[in-house]
Each structure stands twice: as structure tokens, then as C-alpha cells.
């Protein structure tokens, strides 16, 4: 799908976290964030995008730093509630537009998912993330499958793009990343402010991909994510992105 701007979009719903324990996703300890800024002057800018046809809900939670894994799972539930309204009580969507981004509206279900995932002060293991989400979905008469998209130590972008086209989000478990705090587009200049998180654990629900090309040569690729404390942001696909594990989530 080509537009005047050459746009590929890999949107993610991101959930910030850090951890001391390697197997755990989500803990406030050991986080380091640095800020950098990049300015790109251009004569022509193209953008390509590929994303699910509807956005994911941006559920907020009390503790964004340790609840990233249940938040990622709960966002997947909200996304699939569009097709299977028995997953959550209340309305998440009106048409394809998200009308309820408050987890307080689904408090009982969120707490149930946290308990099923065995949420601890150190976070949630990938194994318990999958087991907890599976049990939650099966209690409501549905099933969930997890298909790995890992290849050569990272998430395979092509598999992810095919998943988005099939209306399936991808959960990623990260050991490091950075995200766009601000992207200003004025005249023929893009100014991008990045925050880098190193030595962290963090869970992300990805639902699209975006590629900017400037003057045919300079490329910037991103996952668009929901960060919990920053809302929807772009997460660069670059050397800072360290994917430990990743799965397509398919609820039927």
C-alpha cells in the first residue's frame, strides 16, 4: 500500500519494564535511560506502512514498570475482544475505533490475568505469560496459539508483517530498546528525540511497522508501540533493539 510517503509500519503496543532476573519481564530495577536527538533534512520523504486494520487499546495500569507483561496480554485481549466480546466485559471498540482505554473499566479481568500469569515483584516469566493468557482465554470458551517469529536471534520482520496483514499482533520480550519521545516534522526537516533503555526487561504487543525513506537513501524503521507511561510511540528497529523472544498471538 504505497502512499505519497513511502511508509511501512510495524506498530507495537509496548509495555515498559526492567528486571534483575534474566527470565523475568518487568521490574523497575537496573534501568538506564539516555536521551539523544537526530535531525534529518530532506528534499523528498516516502513512507510505507503495514499494520492491523484497527488500533490496539492503550490500557493504563497502576505500576507501568513491573506490569508490562500482563498489560501486553491484556492489550491482546482487548484487541481480540473486537471479534470475541466475551473476552472482556464492556465495550473496547466502537466500530474499529478504541473507545475505552481505561483498565479500571475491566479491573476484575485484569487482576484475574495478573494472577493467572503469577505476577511477582520481579515481573512475569515468558512461560507464565503464555500459560496465564491461555488459561484466561480458555475459561471463556476460546483458544489461543503462540507462533514463534524468532530467526537468527531476533524477530523476523517479514513474518511479523504477514501477521499484521492477517490481523494478528505479535508479543515481543525485549532485553533493550529505545523509543521516540518526540518526532517533529516541519517543512523539509524531521527532528527525532530518542530515549534509550538499556539492561532492561520489557514486554511489547506489536501491531504494525513503519519505514521512512529520505531522499531514496536514508532509512528509519520503527515498531509503533504503546509504552504504558508514554502512550503510543515509535520504537526504532536498530542496534538498540534486543529481542529475546517473540510470538504471534492468535485467539480463535
Where would I find each of the regions flagged by the language model?
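N-terminal secretory signal peptides that target proteins for export/translocation
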Residues: 1-4
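Sec-dependent N-terminal signal peptides of Gram-positive bacterial secreted proteins and lipoproteins
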Residues: 6-27
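Active-site-adjacent structural segments surrounding the nucleophilic cysteine of cysteine proteases
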Residues: 24-126
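Structural recognition of the beta-strand scaffold that forms the well-ordered cores
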Residues: 67-70, 75, 146-148, 169-174, ...
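Substrate-binding/catalytic groove segments of enzymes
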Residues: 84-86, 140, 144, 212-218
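Active-site signature of cysteine proteases
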Residues: 157-158, 165, 174-252
